Amino acid sequence: MVDIKPEQTQEGNNNDHLVQSDDPEHPANLIPELCRKFYSLGWVTGTGGGTSIRRGEHIFIAPSGVQKELIKPNEIFVLSYPTPKYPPSARKYIRKPSALNPSACTPLFLAAFDRGAGCCIHTHSQWAVMVTLLVEREKGKSGCFEISNIEQIKGIPRGKGKGMLGFFDTLKIPIIENTAFEEDLTESLEKAMEEYPDTYAVLVRRHGIYVWGDTPAKAKTQCESLDYLFQLAVQMHAHSLPWVVNESA
């Protein structure tokens, strides 16, 4: 048996052992499974979107520009963490599949991991896009998405170590403007994280959303809860129903 040296990259054996496991919860197996589920929900259509998981000192990332529902474990990129966001050439890839491109979402995923996340999901959900447009029309570009008095809000954390939001709480999700290139979103994403320190998601106008969680399971369920709320909000707006209930009215 050939000894595998972790420090080797694509010039050597490419550290294939990092993505080889029979454990369904291993990031190299879980990312393709999650992407298949997200594709079925219309979140990663046409190669859009992405998913990344941090496990210890390794970050596992789906490749860019591929059909997300067809991703295989051996197509997963692996980064050593911590690693620089910029320039891309400084990032510490310890596994790079041949003929595939690293995710353009990488620096945004890293921003979530720098906040302690264990998983970050990026989707192109139509409902997420729609609420960014409705907020812009109603509140202007500086407005954030807000909704209250909906049971599903309980699926969203109140903040790190603060438990979950309650039925009567108002969920607030910041919105940033889209850019021509994905990586150029990083600065405004990090600014939104600073302005909304308790948020676990950032919407991108006319683009989609980034959602992160302490674990892959939490990131997934939070993403599902948010998409439910976005869809409901669009339908509520169509019926002239307010998103935030004014209890004093």
Curated annotation (Swiss-Prot):
A single Gene Ontology CC annotation of this entry is: cytoplasm
List residues binding substrate. Answer: 105
Report which reactions are catalysed by this protein.
5-(methylsulfanyl)-D-ribulose 1-phosphate = 5-methylsulfanyl-2,3-dioxopentyl phosphate + H2O
One GO molecular function term?
zinc ion binding
Cofactors per UniProt? Zn(2+)
According to the UniProt entry, which residue ranges have a biased composition of type Polar residues?
9-18
Which residues of the sequence carry a binding annotation for Zn(2+)? 122, 124, 207
- Active-site residues annotated for this sequence: 151
Kindly give the InterPro entries that the UniProt entry links to this protein: Aldolase_II/adducin_N, Aldolase_II/adducin_N_sf, MethylthioRu-1-P_deHdtase_MtnB, Salvage_MtnB_euk
Question: Where is this protein found?
Answer: Cytoplasm
Q: Does the keyword Heme apply?
A: no
Q: A Gene Ontology biological process annotation?
A: L-methionine salvage from methylthioadenosine
Record's cofactor remark: Binds 1 zinc ion per subunit.
Pfam families recorded: Aldolase_II
- Region entry Disordered, spans: 1-25
What pairs make up the disulfide bonds?
Answer: none
- Quote the pathway field: Amino-acid biosynthesis; L-methionine biosynthesis via salvage pathway; L-methionine from S-methyl-5-thio-alpha-D-ribose 1-phosphate: step 2/6
EC annotation from Swiss-Prot or TrEMBL? 4.2.1.109
Keyword terms, alphabetized: Amino-acid biosynthesis, Cytoplasm, Lyase, Metal-binding, Methionine biosynthesis, Zinc
PANTHER family, per database record: METHYLTHIORIBULOSE-1-PHOSPHATE DEHYDRATASE
UniProt lists the family membership as follows: Belongs to the aldolase class II family. MtnB subfamily.
What job does the chain carry out?
A: Catalyzes the dehydration of methylthioribulose-1-phosphate (MTRu-1-P) into 2,3-diketo-5-methylthiopentyl-1-phosphate (DK-MTP-1-P).
Protein name, as recorded:
Methylthioribulose-1-phosphate dehydratase
Identify the species of origin: Arthroderma otae (strain ATCC MYA-4605 / CBS 113480) (Microsporum canis)
